[in-house]
């Protein structure tokens, strides 16, 4: 066994740089608000958008990227080929590194078609997609879309800054967007979903910063009556970079239609 008494403590620097900084110059940086999709046929797809950020003035989610790609995650954990499912302006199958999803297997093509037919899933592409993209139902600059279904079938939608809206037609159109009363939140994602007992929860940063992380509960998905702490710590920032914020933030759950795990 190792003798830890002889080990010398060597503190690591607070800021560490990932391997990407040691590689050759790259053409794109991955950005995604949504990373997974489970098809009706049981196909698991990983997805992300290739953005371009060459300088501090660039954002990987400014609508000026290359496009969104998908690849199958197989049951043994191996990965299938990469395919483009969406192209930003100026890009197509002829000037990109991977083929279009129409050249994938029948099962993967069907899964991609499900995504393209799902307005609630496409809404999560709004930041990376072209500005004014017709595929996006609400293309007005709001960020970090999230939604869940109410008992009466309406879709309750959430964005950053506690912006909320309702959809009466499954996500194709939405009511006027308003800021939720009493919902303290600034520039960070809010995640909301229906729980296994039929109640609802939102997980977010109830402050003007990206800490602490809290959870609020609701019986009907519209009126939230509790607020409890999940994490109040602000760990040191290990990696430097542009648009980095401290604190526990950008929580996601499992979106509707992608399965419901058993309660522990």
Kindly give the residue locations of the regions a language model identified.
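Asp-box/BNR beta-propeller blade signature and adjacent active/binding-site loops
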Residues: 1-264
């Amino acid at each position: 066994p190792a003798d830890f008494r002889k080990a010398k403590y060597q503190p690591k620097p607070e800021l560490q740089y990932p391997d990407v900084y040691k590689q050759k110059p790259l053409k794109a940086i991955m950005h995604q608000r949504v990373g997974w999709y489970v098809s009706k046929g049981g196909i698991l797809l990983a997805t992300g958008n290739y953005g371009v950020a060459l300088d501090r003035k660039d954002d990987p989610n400014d609508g000026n990227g290359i496009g969104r790609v998908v690849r199958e995650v197989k049951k043994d954990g191996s990965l299938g080929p990469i395919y483009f499912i969406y192209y930003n302006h100026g890009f197509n199958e002829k000037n990109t590194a991977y083929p279009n999803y129409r050249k994938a297997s029948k099962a993967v093509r069907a899964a991609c078609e499900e995504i393209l037919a799902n307005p609630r899933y496409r809404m999560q592409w709004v930041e990376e997609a072209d500005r004014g993209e017709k595929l996006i139902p609400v293309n007005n600059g709001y960020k970090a879309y999230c939604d869940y279904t109410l008992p009466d079938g309406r879709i309750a939608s959430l964005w950053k800054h506690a912006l909320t809206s309702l959809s009466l037609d499954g996500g194709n159109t939405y009511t006027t967007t308003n800021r939720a009363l009493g919902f303290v939140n600034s520039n960070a994602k809010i995640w909301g979903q229906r729980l296994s007992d039929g109640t609802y929860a939102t997980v977010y940063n109830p402050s003007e910063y990206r800490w602490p992380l809290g959870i609020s509960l609701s019986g009907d998905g519209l009126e939230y009556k509790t607020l409890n702490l999940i994490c109040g710590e602000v760990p040191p920032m290990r990696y430097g970079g542009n648009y980095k914020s401290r604190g526990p933030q950008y929580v996601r759950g499992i979106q509707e239609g992608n399965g419901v795990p058993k309660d522990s």
